[in-house]
Amino acid sequence: MNEIKKTYKNYVGGKYVRSESGKTFRIELKNEFYEVPLTSRKDIRDAVVAAKKGHTAWQKLSPYNKTQVLYRLSEMLVGNFETYQQLLQDAGLTKAKAKDDIHKAVDSIIWYAGMADKWEQMTGNLNPVAGDFFNISHQESLGVVFTLNSNTQSLNSLLLNMLPALTVGCSVISFNEENSVLALKLAEDINNSDLPGGALNILSGKFELLIEDISNHVEITAMAIYKEIHNDQKTMIKENASKSLKRIFINPPTMGLEALFPFIETKTVWHPKGR
């Protein structure tokens, strides 16, 4: 019987979709070639539409429910431990390092799951003001966030590029290049983790082909660049982003409370004190 090779697709709006371009690019893992989608401009636009809907659905869940959903993802990873281990070993990691990376990935998810219903208490505050008023800082998620993920062949690194924005209630468009096979495999577990469709979208492709379209898209609220890019690309992104006041973060933190700060904005509420 002939071997049936797995067909990897983008994950957008809770569905597996082929690229509108009809094109793929090749990734080699342990002398075996994988064809993954070459995302087009139309695919990016579709992902933004899905992410906007996903943001609304993700925001409707209570913080406690978000915690449950993220914890469910850690359970899915544990259930597919051997599959991830083999992928990481095919990418060049030793068996011991692959196992360690997956254990760290599970720990990272559990940490962020625990933060999903606590971060607002830890970042908001009551501000001292003159007069008989309460002045309270309230934090909200930014909206649709595009992440350019690191090329590091690491499940933990991949998740840490997505989780900070997702934890505070943003929807995420996760873009991957050399680690696309790992990312698209992760999409299968995300699909089974009860995350609302569109809250997390995973694409593969070549960033340099789409950099202008992504940085110019007015409905992408923020871009988090976790991969090393050229200075001229950074300049282009910042110039294009300025037209829509898009927030740009180059190599932001990936762990700890400070990793959440780029993806939230502060609103203040004034309320008269009772007498």
Spans of features found by a protein language model:
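N-terminal Rossmann-like NAD(P)+-binding subdomain of aldehyde/semialdehyde dehydrogenases
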Residues: 1-131, 164, 177-178, 192, ...
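Alpha-helix N-cap/helix-start motif
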Residues: 20, 81, 98, 155-158, ...
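Conserved small-residue-rich beta-alpha loop and adjacent elements
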Residues: 110, 114-193
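Conserved NAD(P)+-binding/catalytic subdomain of aldehyde/semialdehyde dehydrogenases
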Residues: 129, 135, 139-148, 193-275
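Conserved active-site and cofactor/substrate-binding residues in soluble primary-metabolism enzymes
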Residues: 42, 46, 100, 104, ...
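Residue-level signal for inorganic ion chemistry
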Residues: 30, 66, 169, 200, ...
